[in-house]
Design a protein with these regions (language model features):
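Histidine-centered catalytic micro-motifs
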Residues: 9, 28-33, 43-55, 80-85
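N-terminal small/glycine-rich loop or linker at the start of catalytic domains
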Residues: 1-23, 87-96, 126-133
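Catalytic alpha/beta core domains of metabolic enzymes, predominantly
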Residues: 124-247, 258
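Glycine-rich, proline-tolerant flexible connector loops at the mouths of alpha/beta enzymes
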Residues: 19, 44-68, 134, 192-193, ...
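Alpha-helix-loop-beta-strand connector modules within alpha/beta enzyme cores
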Residues: 9, 56-85, 148-155, 208-216, ...
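Mid-to-C-terminal alpha-helical segments outside catalytic/metal-binding sites
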Residues: 266, 270-291
């Protein structure tokens, strides 16, 4: 029998999407409740960003992360917690003076970007091994920054999830594994597909990136927007795990907004089981990932 498939649920993200679907959770209570609901629907992992409760905009406030994590743990939910470290990597140059950062730039130190991880000690945290045009904004993660973040994360006892958005990012992540920056005999990669202007969300691209990974790696993949569910099926076929959630896609079907993260997880579970595979529970997921 093939290995059970782990479903991860990305609950809210950092995009300006809270007004596009009322189901997008904003407050720590809403985010924690969505985590618990997604877990009950079949997600063994929840991937967490936080938002300013007043504005709905993305936030890096460690107090908000702590409240979300505490609420999930206090509820006794067995879900594996995965916190983001993505915010703090946006550099926008002034058009007339490119060496000068524009007002929309948000660049933080490694310590600032992982402070909530060190404090809350989740099971996993994402590490964006990527410098790219992320839509209309440059995302900058220099190798020295990534190395320092990886060290701080692992010193806190947390497993890095290496998020890669194109083939060059896979090469850098592999280099970090090969040189011992990532000290993990089961390194975890997330193949992020369909984001402008990274790798497209196709089965061919997923396969190409998968074939670049170390033999001992665990991997998952996701596609954004209308590619979310096709990429679930592709990941199952290609031997990986999958991710869904309102961070990546606001719709359950064409023109129909998802009622919540649990609905997206339930659909992913249906796809996995219809393909003859088993959905991993939290215990199985921990064993697979070496947590």
């Amino acid at each position: 029998m093939s290995e059970p498939i782990i479903i991860s649920c990305a609950l809210t993200g950092a995009a300006d999407s809270a007004g596009a679907n009322p189901a997008v959770p904003v407050t720590p209570e809403e985010i924690a409740n969505e985590a618990i609901a997604a877990n009950k629907a079949g997600a063994a992992i929840v991937h967490i960003h936080v938002r300013n409760p007043e504005t709905g905009k993305a936030s890096m406030d460690p107090k908000l992360y702590k409240e979300v994590v505490d609420r999930i743990r206090d509820a006794g939910a067995p879900v594996i917690i995965n916190l983001t470290t993505g915010p703090g990597a946006r550099f926008v140059p002034e058009l007339d003076n490119p060496s000068q950062a524009a007002a929309t730039t948000v660049m933080k130190t490694a310590e600032e970007r992982v402070a909530h991880v060190v404090e809350n000690k989740p099971d996993i945290c994402s590490l964006d091994v990527a410098t790219m045009n992320f839509g209309d904004r440059p995302m900058v993660n220099a190798p020295d920054m990534l190395n320092k973040m990886a060290t701080l994360i692992q010193d806190a006892g947390v497993k890095p999830e290496l998020e890669v958005f194109d083939t060059g990012h896979v090469r850098l992540a592999n280099h970090m594994v090969e040189t011992g920056v990532i000290k993990d005999d089961k390194p975890l990669y997330q193949l992020c597909l369909g984001i402008p202007w990274g790798a497209p969300a196709t089965a061919e691209m997923m396969m190409a990136m998968r074939d670049m990974l170390p033999a001992n790696a665990n991997w998952a993949s996701f596609g954004i927007s209308r590619f979310e569910f096709p990429m679930v099926a592709s990941a199952v076929l290609l031997g990986g795990h999958c991710r869904v959630g309102l961070e990546d896609n606001l719709y359950i079907s064409r023109g129909e907004l998802a009622s919540g993260n649990a609905q997206l997880v339930s659909r992913a579970k249906e796809i996995i089981e219809s393909m003859g595979s088993e959905v991993a529970n939290e215990k199985q997921a921990r064993e697979i990932l070496g947590l």
